């Protein structure tokens, strides 16, 4: 098998609110489907994420402990985790703080050669915002 593209599908509790959350992160609403809409997609560059209200997968609870570090609990959140590779992790962090998004882990140079931060969607999905360093 040769894969040509991978598009994750996230279970969300409110499609309209999720579109607004992704817009704060700097993504754009690509499309929606249904009346009222219960399925849609957000886009950034060549990347797309599908959002499905109340179906297709599970979601976490949001507002839980940090994702890494001595007080972190990677298993406390049952939402999906995804890595998004960017040019400037610190610029994304500034945008998240300015927009009031929940930063679960601040920008940190990790021992595996990546600078990354974590931002949590209200439904508990965690996005690892990363770039290679070194």
Labelled PLM ranges:
Residues 11-13:
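Short, surface-exposed ligand-recognition loops at beta-strand->loop->(often short) alpha-helix junctions
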Residues 1-9, 24-120, 130-134:
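Vicinal oxygen chelate
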Residues 16-20, 91:
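Alpha-helical macromolecular-interaction surfaces
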């Amino acid at each position: 098998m040769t894969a040509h593209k991978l598009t994750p599908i996230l279970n969300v509790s409110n499609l309209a609110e999720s579109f607004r959350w992704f817009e704060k992160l700097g993504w754009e609403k690509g499309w929606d489907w249904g009346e009222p809409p219960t399925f849609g997609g957000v886009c950034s560059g060549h990347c797309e994420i599908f959002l499905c209200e109340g179906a297709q997968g599970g979601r976490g609870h949001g507002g839980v402990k940090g994702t890494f570090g001595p007080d972190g609990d990677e298993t406390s959140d049952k939402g999906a985790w995804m890595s998004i590779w960017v040019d400037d992790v610190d610029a994304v962090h500034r945008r998240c703080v300015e927009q009031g998004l929940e930063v679960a882990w601040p920008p940190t140079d990790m021992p595996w050669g990546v600078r990354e931060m974590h931002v949590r969607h209200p439904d508990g999905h965690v996005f690892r915002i990363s770039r290679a360093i070194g």
